[in-house]
């Protein structure tokens, strides 16, 4: 297994699919990375030599991935909560942020039902 950005990616899959095992890299970004390096999408990781893997690592390093991306996302949410804007309040109260209804749905976000205490 090749190791890119701290993630073991599978050898027996196509390069595009293997790169998507890295948090922050989807199919579109994986295709762009492979095009920049000059590798076809259907090439399997085990068929690549060390120079090509190093080139892929260099391209992946330009994209925020794994821990850096997770930290950036959590800092963005924290910033919204500190501002006190509507989206920040919804995050703070663990309610849907993007305008979904909450009268009957949103059980995943709100958690299990709490019984009414008499």
UniProtKB/Swiss-Prot annotation:
The UniProt entry, under SUPFAM superfamilies, shows: S13-like H2TH domain (SSF46946)
Which keywords accompany this UniProt record?
Answer: Ribonucleoprotein, Ribosomal protein, RNA-binding, rRNA-binding, tRNA-binding
Q: Name one GO biological process term.
A: translation
Instruction: Please give the Gene Ontology molecular function terms for this protein.
Output: rRNA binding; structural constituent of ribosome; tRNA binding
> Region Disordered: which residues?
92-118
- rRNA-binding recorded as keyword: yes
InterPro entries recorded: Rbsml_uS13_C, Ribosomal_uS13, Ribosomal_uS13-like_H2TH, Ribosomal_uS13_bac-type, Ribosomal_uS13_CS
Which GO terms of the cellular component aspect does the record hold? Answer: cytosol; small ribosomal subunit
Its quaternary structure?
A: Part of the 30S ribosomal subunit. Forms a loose heterodimer with protein S19. Forms two bridges to the 50S subunit in the 70S ribosome.
Protein's job: Located at the top of the head of the 30S subunit, it contacts several helices of the 16S rRNA. In the 70S ribosome it contacts the 23S rRNA (bridge B1a) and protein L5 of the 50S subunit (bridge B1b), connecting the 2 subunits; these bridges are implicated in subunit movement. Contacts the tRNAs in the A and P-sites.
Report the sequence similarity comment from the record: Belongs to the universal ribosomal protein uS13 family.
Q: What's the protein called, per UniProt?
A: Small ribosomal subunit protein uS13
Species classification: Bacteria, Pseudomonadati, Pseudomonadota, Gammaproteobacteria, Moraxellales
Gene name? rpsM
């Amino acid at each position: 297994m090749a190791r890119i950005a701290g993630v073991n990616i599978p050898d027996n899959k196509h390069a595009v699919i293997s790169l998507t095992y890295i948090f922050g890299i989807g199919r579109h970004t994986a295709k762009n990375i492979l095009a920049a390096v000059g590798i076809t999408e259907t090439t399997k990781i085990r068929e690549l030599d060390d120079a090509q893997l190093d080139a892929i690592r260099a391209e992946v390093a330009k994209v925020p991935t794994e821990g850096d991306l997770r930290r950036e996302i959590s800092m963005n949410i924290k910033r919204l909560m500190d501002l006190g804007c509507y989206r920040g309040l919804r995050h703070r109260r663990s309610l849907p942020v993007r305008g979904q209804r909450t009268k009957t749905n949103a059980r995943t976000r709100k958690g299990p039902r709490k019984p009414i205490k008499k």
